[in-house]
Amino acid sequence: MSFSRSAADAADTLPDLAATLGAPAERAFVTLGDAFHTRLPAAPLAAPYVVGFSDDVAQLLDLPPSIAAQPGFAELFAGNPTRDWPAHAMPYASVYSGHQFGVWAGQLGDGRALTIGELPGTDGRRYELQLKGGGRTPYSRMGDGRAVLRSSIREFLCSEAMHHLGIPTTRALTVIGSDQPVVREEIETAAVVTRVSESFVRFGHFEHFFSNDRPDLLRQLADHVIDRFYPACRDADDPYLALLEAATLRTADLVAQWQAVGFCHGVMNTDNMSILGVTIDYGPFGFVDAFDANHICNHSDTSGRYAYRMQPRIAHWNCYCLAQALLPLIGLQHGIADDDARAERAVDDAQAVLAKFPERFGPALERAMRAKLGLELEREGDAELANKLLETMHASHADFTLTFRRLAQISKHDASRDAPVRDLFIDREAFDAWANLYRARLSEETRDDAARAVAMNRANPKYVLRNHLAEVAIRRAKEKDFSEVERLAQILRRPFDEQPEHEAYAALPPDWAGSLEVSCSS
């Protein structure tokens, strides 16, 4: 269905939007059957109101930007449609399992997320819409099924910020707030964020059917993912091994991009890993400020399992979990009669695929770091040069984002221009030593300083969603002032542009930012 962009038509759209979202032919995941999900209505928020709205996502879904101002919009995306959910359009929560902090957690599932259907995108793809905070489900365990305003604003802002950084991610259409109280570490208010993605299938979905010894359902799920998202795998000698390889390589690429911008996910459990290799489940995430390779963004991660430097290793480990779940399917087409022989070959084939993770991740990160350093030519010592910079940053706790952004000001021939970036380092002699190595490397490049600076500023964002910026927006939103949410969203749409009128948003964090803590208690 295509939506016009007039305000009048936007108003006409809303009464039928729930039915449109839930049209059976448009909900491929639902057609897999009851073993994969539970249908139930959302538990609507009381007196909902719009906190944030993404024009970009609306445009992607061919929705008029004016739709957010229409009566009924907040109600629909708070889980309360303008009329009862049609039987065929009832939202659903999916079931999955997974490893949490490295320990098998058993059955999990969408404990507070309800998928309300699909819409066609203007890019030719189809997108699922999911209400995070839509109420209790059979998979809520001890939870209340709610999300709170602070975490919903953070996810809304970061989903869109990551997209504009060029990093694969789920998107966010809107945040709906309410004065409805929710008990966490303190009394907060409830909210719902509407997530948008081609699919919300996770590694944990495969683990669930593997752990329950349901190879038939495991194969059904894998076929769905292959046919809809990885059609090239169908033509491979072993489609399920090809699926594992595709997901593994996408995951390696994704984490390389995280590392390159200093992004920490915070909760890289297998149930928080997308089979499409996109960033999903924004919880206690954070962008590194003062660089520490051991930075832990999640206050609940007392062991540092998901620290910045650990993310590549954990992503690789998670791919092993996915491989284990897919083992019953790998090699089926080879016609090996002996089950033990087939299983042994499946393990060997899976291990060969998993060995490709570091082979993919290393070069991907090297390419990203070479771009961040403004190096066009590939030289053997480039990775060592980048690592030496990170070590020097780590020792001085130099700001990650500002360091890389200001490197563009370094001149091949004039060390006096180093001051803006040099001043970020406590040990300036150590920086000088690195800068001399860098200048020597730049002498091998053909671009002049100006051309290199332009290229570097396209690789090094000036603006990222620092925790203190999100915190200011959240505090104002709690007072019903949503202007800072909108302002931040607009700034983060153009992370690589100078935007001199917003210079304060690119500054070093204030002292009070060091006391901010984010955890899993959203």
UniProtKB/Swiss-Prot annotation:
The protein's required cofactors: Mg(2+); Mn(2+)
Active site: D271
Keyword hit for Isomerase: no
Residues binding Mg(2+): N272, D281
EC number: 2.7.7.-, 2.7.7.108
Amino acids binding ATP: G109, G111, R112, K132, D144, G145, R195, R202, D281
Keyword ATP-binding: yes
Coiled coil: none
InterPro entries (UniProt xref): SelO
Enzyme class, UniProt record, top EC level: transferase
Keywords associated with the record: ATP-binding, Magnesium, Manganese, Metal-binding, Nucleotide-binding, Nucleotidyltransferase, Transferase
Pfam families referenced in this protein's UniProt entry, alphabetically: SelO (PF02696)
Reactions it catalyzes: L-seryl-[protein] + ATP = 3-O-(5'-adenylyl)-L-seryl-[protein] + diphosphate; L-threonyl-[protein] + ATP = 3-O-(5'-adenylyl)-L-threonyl-[protein] + diphosphate; L-tyrosyl-[protein] + ATP = O-(5'-adenylyl)-L-tyrosyl-[protein] + diphosphate; L-histidyl-[protein] + UTP = N(tele)-(5'-uridylyl)-L-histidyl-[protein] + diphosphate
MF terms in GO: AMPylase activity; ATP binding; magnesium ion binding
Family affiliation: Belongs to the SELO family.
NCBIfam families, per database record: PRK00029.1
HAMAP family: YdiU_SelO (MF_00692)
Cited function: Nucleotidyltransferase involved in the post-translational modification of proteins. It can catalyze the addition of adenosine monophosphate (AMP) or uridine monophosphate (UMP) to a protein, resulting in modifications known as AMPylation and UMPylation.
Name of this protein: Protein nucleotidyltransferase YdiU
Taxonomy of the source species: Bacteria, Pseudomonadati, Pseudomonadota, Betaproteobacteria, Burkholderiales
